[in-house]
């Protein structure tokens, strides 16, 4: 008798993706983040759905509806903080997932990588719009500052900004449409994830050595299902520690003040996971230049497959490239720190140097070091 798992039209798709999937035998814990991102997305969609049941997207009532969720709804505070801190966990996993891809050369899977970059953009857009919804001071001013950047686009900029705002400033129309987009985008993310997995399963997973592993594959279940469960437990533990012990650790106190268009907060800054890009934006005195640098700081990921000149795929056996990679990580941490600092000496110059170094490492130093390593290995 044939196994239903292998013959049923729907179940066999799940079987080929999560059960009988041939997987390299040597993939490390760095390969756990795909499933953890899936879990984060599921948590965000579920908690977001319950929040949307009680939230009102009107400038007069948005802030008080969030207060109502936290005070009056059964476990509303838990749902709200799981959603807010779930976003932070989502981005931690995203950055680690992308970092893994860069370190082990996973970007040579061209389609998978590029859809991943698109996913990163869409998730960032979703998170930005979600931050606007509580309608606190930082929500309002963050939305004003970031949407205003589009006015730097020549000729159509101002019209475009007013079109996005639905008026002449961030107001009711803006909040309503941001809520609509924030609700629908995670489902688009889920669809893109399916495409991401589709392309990944065309080639199979990469592995730490960067070598072809077709001769040494093992089934995904039970080996990697059990390994993923460990990651899931650690992620949920970290999230719940954050939610239950210091839920406001990563938030901004200004967001507990209702939005006031007549009063600008002294330091406007986005959530921590955007600070590196915000620092790059601020480091360029020209508005259009800053916007281009901001976009290119993420878009540069699409260039990695083209800039890969090494004869080896992974950095596992390339100590010089490893050095450059960790320089890049340190630089990104520096940018994140600078993004949260006021615009004054010495932070301005540190931000400019760190921004310049970010692009220099990726566009110049990594390829150069790869060529040197090729020569050292007499290849």
UniProtKB/Swiss-Prot annotation:
Annotated residues for binding of heme b b562: 83, 182
Membrane topology according to the record: Multi-pass membrane protein
Transmembrane residue ranges: 33-53, 77-98, 113-133, 178-198, 226-246, 288-308, 320-340, 347-367
InterPro entries: Cyt_b/b6_C (IPR005798), Cyt_b/b6_C_sf (IPR036150), Cyt_b/b6_N (IPR005797), Cytb/b6-like_sf (IPR027387), Cytochrome_b (IPR030689), Cytochrome_b_C_euk/bac (IPR048260), Cytochrome_b_N_euk/bac (IPR048259), Di-haem_cyt_TM (IPR016174)
Keywords: Electron transport, Heme, Iron, Membrane, Metal-binding, Mitochondrion, Mitochondrion inner membrane, Respiratory chain, Transmembrane, Transmembrane helix, Transport, Ubiquinone
SUPFAM superfamilies, sorted: a domain/subunit of cytochrome bc1 complex (Ubiquinol-cytochrome c reductase), Transmembrane di-heme cytochromes
Gene3D superfamilies: Cytochrome Bc1 Complex, Chain C
Gene Ontology cellular component annotations, sorted alphabetically: mitochondrial inner membrane; respiratory chain complex III
One example GO MF annotation: ubiquinol-cytochrome-c reductase activity
CDD domains in the record: cytochrome_b_C, Cytochrome_b_N
Binding residues annotated for heme b b566, in chain numbering: 97, 196
Pfam families recorded: Cytochrom_B_C, Cytochrome_B
Chain residues that bind a ubiquinone: 201
Main localization, broad class: mitochondrion
Locations listed in the record: Mitochondrion inner membrane
Ribosomal protein keyword on record: no
GO biological process, one term: mitochondrial electron transport, ubiquinol to cytochrome c
Cofactor note: Binds 2 heme b groups non-covalently.
PANTHER family in alphabetical order: CYTOCHROME B
Family statement drawn from the similarity comment of this UniProt entry: Belongs to the cytochrome b family.
Protein name in UniProt: Cytochrome b
Organism: Cynomys mexicanus
Source species taxonomy: Eukaryota, Metazoa, Chordata, Craniata, Vertebrata
Gene: MT-CYB
């Amino acid at each position: 008798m044939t196994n239903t798992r292998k013959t049923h039209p729907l179940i066999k798709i799940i079987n080929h993706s999560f059960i009988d999937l041939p997987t390299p035998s040597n993939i490390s814990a760095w390969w756990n983040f795909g499933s953890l991102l899936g879990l984060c997305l599921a948590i965000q969609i579920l908690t977001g759905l319950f929040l949307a049941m009680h939230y009102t997207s009107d400038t007069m009532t948005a802030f008080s509806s969030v207060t109502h969720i936290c005070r009056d709804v059964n476990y509303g505070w838990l749902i709200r903080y799981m959603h807010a801190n779930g976003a932070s966990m989502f981005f931690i996993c995203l950055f680690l997932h992308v970092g893994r891809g860069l370190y082990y050369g996973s970007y040579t899977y061209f389609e998978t990588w590029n859809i991943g970059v698109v996913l990163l953009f869409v998730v960032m857009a979703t998170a930005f719009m979600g931050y606007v919804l509580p309608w606190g001071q930082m929500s309002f001013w963050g939305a004003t500052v970031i949407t205003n950047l589009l006015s730097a686009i020549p000729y159509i900029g101002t019209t475009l900004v007013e079109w996005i705002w639905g008026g002449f400033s961030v107001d009711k129309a803006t909040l309503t449409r941001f809520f609509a987009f924030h609700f629908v985008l995670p489902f688009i993310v889920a669809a893109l994830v399916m495409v991401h997995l589709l392309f990944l399963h065309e080639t199979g997973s990469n592995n730490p050595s960067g070598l072809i592993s077709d001769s040494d594959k093992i089934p995904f279940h039970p080996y990697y299902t059990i390994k993923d469960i460990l990651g899931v437990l650690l992620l949920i533990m970290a999230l719940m520690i954050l939610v239950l012990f210091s839920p406001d650790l990563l938030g901004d106190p200004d967001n507990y003040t209702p939005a006031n268009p007549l009063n600008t907060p002294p330091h406007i800054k986005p959530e921590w996971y955007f600070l590196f890009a915000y620092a790059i934006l601020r480091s360029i005195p020209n508005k259009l230049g800053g916007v281009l640098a901001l976009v290119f700081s993420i878009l540069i990921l699409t260039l990695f497959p083209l800039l890969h000149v090494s004869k080896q795929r992974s950095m596992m056996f390339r100590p010089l490239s490893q050095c450059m990679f960790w320089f890049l990580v340190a630089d990104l941490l520096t940018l994140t720190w600078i993004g949260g600092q006021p615009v004054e000496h010495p932070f301005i110059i540190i931000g400019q140097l760190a921004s310049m170094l970010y692009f220099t490492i990726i566009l110049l130093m990594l390829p150069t070091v790869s060529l040197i390593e090729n020569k050292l290995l007499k290849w």
